[in-house]
Swiss-Prot record:
The gene is Bcl2l1. InterPro entries: Apop_reg_BclX, Bcl-2-like_sf, Bcl-2_BH1-3, Bcl-2_fam, Bcl2-like, Bcl2/BclX, Bcl2_BH1_motif_CS, Bcl2_BH2_motif_CS. A motif (BH3) lies at residues 86-100. Proteolytically cleaved by caspases during apoptosis. The cleaved protein, lacking the BH4 motif, has pro-apoptotic activity. It is a single-pass membrane protein. GO terms for molecular function: BH3 domain binding; identical protein binding; protein kinase binding. A motif (BH4) lies at residues 4-24. This is Bcl-2-like protein 1. One of its GO terms (cellular component) is synaptic vesicle membrane.
Length: 233
């Protein structure tokens, strides 16, 4: 379970870093070479036991959902979605999110004022605000996009040590807080059904349908709020 979580996070962050000309391999081992920063090791140690009694993710390299409750039980006869399809759908949805909210997202990244000592507190504050009113697929996409922006900003400001930490924080949060909702709402199969094959971009062409399923509850004002939480008062 934890490996699938981290694999999705690392793939998305690697993709976002590559869009800015950076390589994940430049930063993935920075934390391991430091002795004064235990956050990543602790997070990775906690991740496997973060969710007690919940089924594994609905991915090809994980067991099929076993004993899931609610309407997700109807997925039993469906083909398991490959991990690669989930990764691709996340990439495409993240790109579409940033394209649609380009100006607000630019404000977010330009207002980040982080240091190695305050980064986790800022990450936690923003993510808690993002999901304050509940979870939906659009907010999960925003969560990944925020993590990607945070990594890029960290590298731009020569704080490469934060990249692997951010990956661990995201994987842990995904396990602890988002996976139960994901399983109760059809698993990653449903996400790929909604977002696969660049569905978000296609839906944007039908403007009246976009807000109904892509970013329900996640407005431009919400994105700006994420940025404002990082501003020094």
């Amino acid at each position: 379970m934890s490996q699938s979580n981290r694999e999705l996070v690392v793939d998305f962050l690697s993709y976002k870093l590559s869009q800015k000309g950076y390589s994940w391999s430049q930063f993935s081992d920075v934390e391991e070479n430091r002795t004064e920063a235990p956050e990543e090791t602790e997070a990775e140690r906690e991740t496997p036991s973060a969710i007690n009694g919940n089924p594994s993710w609905h991915l090809a390299d994980s067991p099929a959902v076993n004993g899931a409750t609610g309407h997700s039980s109807s997925l039993d006869a469906r083909e398991v979605i490959p991990m690669a399809a989930v990764k691709q759908a996340l990439r495409e949805a993240g790109d579409e999110f940033e394209l649609r909210y380009r100006r607000a997202f630019s404000d977010l990244t330009s207002q980040l004022h982080i240091t190695p000592g305050t980064a986790y507190q800022s990450f936690e504050q923003v993510v808690n605000e993002l999901f304050r009113d509940g979870v939906n697929w659009g907010r999960i996409v925003a969560f990944f996009s925020f993590g990607g922006a945070l990594c890029v900003e960290s590298v731009d400001k020569e704080m490469q040590v934060l990249v692997s930490r951010i990956a661990s924080w995201m994987a842990t949060y995904l396990n602890d807080h988002l996976e139960p909702w994901i399983q109760e709402n059809g698993g990653w199969d449903t996400f790929v059904d909604l977002y696969g094959n660049n569905a978000a971009a296609e839906s944007r062409k039908g403007q009246e349908r976009f807000n109904r399923w892509f970013l329900t509850g996640m407005t431009v004002a919400g994105v700006v709020l994420l940025g404002s939480l990082f501003s020094r008062k």
